[in-house]
Amino acid sequence: MSILPLPALPVLLTEQSQRALSRLREAAPDEPITDSDSAVLALSDFVSDALALHPDWWQGIHQQPPQPEEWQHYADWLSNALVDVNDENALMAALRRFRRHMLARIAWSQALQTSTTEHSLRQLSELAEVIIVAARSWLYQVCCHEWGTPCNAKGVAQPLLILGMGKLGGGELNFSSDIDLIFVYPENGHTQGGRRELDNAQFFTRLGQRLIKVLDQPTVDGFVYRVDMRLRPFGDSGPLVLSFAAMEDYYQEQGRDWERYAMVKARLMGGMDDAYSQELRSTLKPFVFRRYIDFSVIQSLRNMKGMIAREVRRRDLRNNIKLGAGGIREIEFITQVFQLIRGGREPGLQGRSLLPTLQHVGALGLLTPQQVLDLSTSYLFLRRLENLLQAIADEQTQTLPSDELNQQRLAWGMGFDSWDTLQSMLSQHMQAVRHVFDELIGDDAPDNNDIPEHSSYSSLWQDTLDDGDLAPLTPHLTETVREKLMRTIVEFRNDVAKRTIGPRGRDVLDQLMPCLLAEVCARQEADTVLSRLTPLLLGIVTRTTYLELLLESRAALAQLIRLCAASPMVASQLARYPLLLDELLDASTLYQPTAPGAYADELRQYLMRVPEDDEEQQLEAVRQFKQSQQLRIAAGDIGGVLPVMKVSDHLTYLAEAIIAAVVQQAWGLMVERYGQPSHLQHREGRGFAVIAYGKLGGWELGYSSDLDLVFLLDCPSDVMTDGERSIDGRQFYLRLAQRVMHLFSTRTSSGILYEVDARLRPSGAAGMLVSTVEAFDDYQRNEAWTWEHQALVRARMVYGESGVQQTFESIRRSILCAERDADTLRTEVREMREKMRQHLANKDKSRFDIKTDAGGITDIEFITQYLVLRYAAQEPRLTHWSDNVRILELMAQYGVMEESEANALKLAYVTMRNELHHLALQELSGRVSKDRFVAEREQVLVSWNKWLMGA
């Protein structure tokens, strides 16, 4: 149809038209000018710019005016335009020119109403599809030439199928729109006939990347379409292209409600009707349209309605004809409600285009005739207005203009004599849509968010808020903290959007987050606490049972927040191993660590749940036990139940129990394979011992400490094992030690047990992993350096039978009690300390390294080790303990050191260790301000000078 003769242009539009026409006259001075030219050029800067650059397009419009059905020629026209294209750059230029040319014709026809709004939407959609298909075909041939043709196992060539989503899929694309695509191929396989072979996934990924570049990358000619691939399975974090099988698995196992909404409009680009296309449609259909009337979707729709309402209020979207109340999105939403609920039973509701589907909704009596009429009329009104708005400058916007020129353009283009008249009619249409929307969806169902104190936090979680929206909820926070908090919420919400969460998980998360935010935002350090919680939450968003645990148990949620607020180390542990959340259910056990002597029995009972012959489950169970016990120790630490020395005691008892369990497991595996060494037939025990050095030996274990271990065996040289695969007895113990190391270091889903360092064994890394008791004794007497005797001060046996323990303790005592030249000993200990200090030098003089700097913990350790080696020959009882605190007590008790000095060193040691311990809980380094521990450092240096400098 035509509205010619056209009404007179307002003055402002006449002036705009004359400016545009003057440019065209320069480019095509002989071309006649009509009233239609003046009208279109007044409405669209995009059209006037395009025709000024390509005056032949203007001439073409005069010679062959745009027609409603000319989309049927797009494929042929584009094919002709690509005849001389020989490379990707030329392809990109040709596609951009073609899109711009066709858009100019569509805008011309649209402005003059020589085609209906439905025709314009069809033309815009067909244009995009033709370009996408042509680009795919051109690039497919090029890629096949480079890498061969992708084939399945039977050698059948595999195509790239492209799903157009959203308005493109529905044939309702707007004038300036991005395009939502999903790439998929039928079967896995490899390329054939190319210079190099690729698997199909690689081939189609590369093809997809090149296709996106051809369409999306800005050049001097602009771009063709902004390509959005986020609707694909797993979003941005997923593969760019999936096989049919992978896509089917995803939608069956993890498809979410919003993906059902999106898939309603999915359409294969190119109108393909081959076997592969039919297979893909059949695969997707059960996910989108359920065979039964699917009322389970209603709550999701209500939740979405509430989100829309909050977004309208928050963003003041009254001037947005798509997102505002009663806008285009609500009409689309209303239509899809019926498609998702009843589409499985009603084939007429399975269409992709909105208006035909809306008519079928009316025919089924699901909406009244008046409602269908109101929605259809409003939809066409809004879509025409949207296209005219975007055609002004080829910009993707749905917000009505505030400047007079563009307001007059829209008013005249819509057939109104003024902006106010247009706005009045627009308001009527949007109110009619909103009325149907409210009637259809109803009120949000009551849920957790209806609790008064949580409703605001529901809005905070569900919406993309401005920073200012957070202030009323958190008046006690500073602006800086609010900004950090807001940033964390937004980043978390974006990260969640990339995860594949089922409908139930999404619902639970949406109920949990307001509760969690209400608790967290009440804290002064809300930003810090939330930043510690979000990694954990991201780790469990796809594991609904954990979300439900926190939602249903407010006590567990409270304990989680408390622990994460107190310690980022605990937060990190929970994030890595969510199984630990079960420990939060009972506060009475959470804050009461296992009794020191009960760890071995607790672990034994824990392992009884696991088949003894299942090595993998045994490994996993020991790790889970360690983590749960460490969490309880940390909770007791944070809760003030355990002082720092007791924390180390508990961590040490735990490690000893685990060492025994690991040796037991390794022993069982070795005996099953080789039998046991024959010399054990008439004696108790296993002839194997584990010696702990360092922090474990000294009862000073921390949360992340590694274990310094040395393995000893007690086995005659002529012993063999008694199994069918008999091996040398000492070879058996070597393999046993190797198996122990393997069990400690194997990484399972629950991580490793401990880092184990066995380099303190005789001859270090060059020595045998396990030594005989006799070889250990000989090495310590004849080859060991003074620093190795220092290390022996902190050594003790943590696994083995009493006979081996007595032998080891006898060797240790004998070595430590040996007569030594005082000056030589002092020099060697002092020089070793200097080497360490140089190796671990702290170059930042404004900081004090609590452990390694002068006056720190290492100096105290060297003092105690020196004193044992210096005076144990006179007083053997100085060798009784392996930890620094009790060694200092022995020094005072037996008169080696004044009691006041021993107490001062002990206090300095405990104070600095306590600080190191709490820094570890905060995941901070051991370097503090140089102004810290001044008195303690002075005392340590006085003692250092006294004992090791001879001052």
Swiss-Prot record:
Cofactor: Mg(2+)
Keyword field: ATP-binding, Magnesium, Multifunctional enzyme, Nucleotide-binding, Nucleotidyltransferase, Transferase
UniProt superkingdom: Bacteria
EC number from the UniProt entry: 2.7.7.89, 2.7.7.42
Single GO BP term: regulation of glutamine family amino acid metabolic process
Keyword field contains Nucleotide-binding: yes
Stretch list, region Adenylyl removase: 1-445
Region Adenylyl transferase, residue ranges: 454-951
SUPFAM superfamilies for the chain: Nucleotidyltransferase, Nucleotidyltransferase substrate binding subunit/domain
Entry keyword Cytoplasm: no
Reaction(s) the record says it catalyses: [glutamine synthetase]-O(4)-(5'-adenylyl)-L-tyrosine + phosphate = [glutamine synthetase]-L-tyrosine + ADP; [glutamine synthetase]-L-tyrosine + ATP = [glutamine synthetase]-O(4)-(5'-adenylyl)-L-tyrosine + diphosphate
GO MF term set: [glutamate-ammonia-ligase] adenylyltransferase activity; [glutamine synthetase]-adenylyl-L-tyrosine phosphorylase activity; ATP binding; magnesium ion binding
GO cellular component annotations of the record: cytosol
Family per record: Belongs to the GlnE family.
HAMAP family: GlnE
Function: Involved in the regulation of glutamine synthetase GlnA, a key enzyme in the process to assimilate ammonia. When cellular nitrogen levels are high, the C-terminal adenylyl transferase (AT) inactivates GlnA by covalent transfer of an adenylyl group from ATP to specific tyrosine residue of GlnA, thus reducing its activity. Conversely, when nitrogen levels are low, the N-terminal adenylyl removase (AR) activates GlnA by removing the adenylyl group by phosphorolysis, increasing its activity.
PANTHER family: BIFUNCTIONAL GLUTAMINE SYNTHETASE ADENYLYLTRANSFERASE_ADENYLYL-REMOVING ENZYME, GLUTAMINE SYNTHETASE ADENYLYLTRANSFERASE
Protein name in UniProt: Bifunctional glutamine synthetase adenylyltransferase/adenylyl-removing enzyme
Annotated source species: Pectobacterium atrosepticum (strain SCRI 1043 / ATCC BAA-672) (Erwinia carotovora subsp. atroseptica)
Lineage summary: Bacteria, Pseudomonadati, Pseudomonadota, Gammaproteobacteria, Enterobacterales
